Amino acid sequence: LLDIQLKKDFIDTAQSPYYITEEEEIRSLIKPRKRFAHKGAFGHALLIAGSYGMAGASILSARACLRSGVGLLTVHVPIHNHDLLQTTVPEAIVQTDIHDHYFAEPVDTDRYQAIAIGPGLGQEEDTALAMMEQIQGCPVPLVLDADAINIFGTHRNWLSRMPKRCILTPHL
C-alpha cells in the first residue's frame, strides 16, 4: 500500500453530499420507552430477505431489526424458509413469497414505516426484477443491504432509479 499523501485535515474540509453516521448520532435519536407502551406505537418494518440456503441471513437480520427497537416486524421470505424463520424468530410476522426458493414478487408496502431488502436475497434475474419493482416509488425509508446492493452492481444502468430516501449498508 502506498500513502496517497492527503493532508490530515483534508476529510474535514472536503465538500461531499455523503456522510458517515456515527454511534453518538444514533444514540441521540433513541427515545426512552414507557414501561407498558404498546408495540404498535414503535412502527412496523418490512424485511425482504433470504433465499434457498440463505435462511440464516433472514434470521440474523430479523433479530437485528427487532433489537433496533421496531414494534412490529414482517419478514417476507421464500416459501421454503417459512417454517425455519417462524420457529427461530417467533415474534416476527412471517409472510411468504410466491416462489419456493427466492424473492420473485413485490410486496404491498402500505402499512410499513420502513423497509429493508437484501440479506441473503440471492441474485436471480426474477429477484432483481422484483426488487426493482419493489423499491421504485418506495414512499418510506429504505435500507438496501447485501444482495440488493450486489444486484445494482450487475445492473449498473438501474442506479439512476434508486430511490432518494435510501440507505446503503455495504460490507467494507
Regions flagged by a language model, labelled:
Residues 1-146, 150-172:
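Small-residue (G/A/S/T)-rich helix-start motifs and N-terminal tracts that mark the onset
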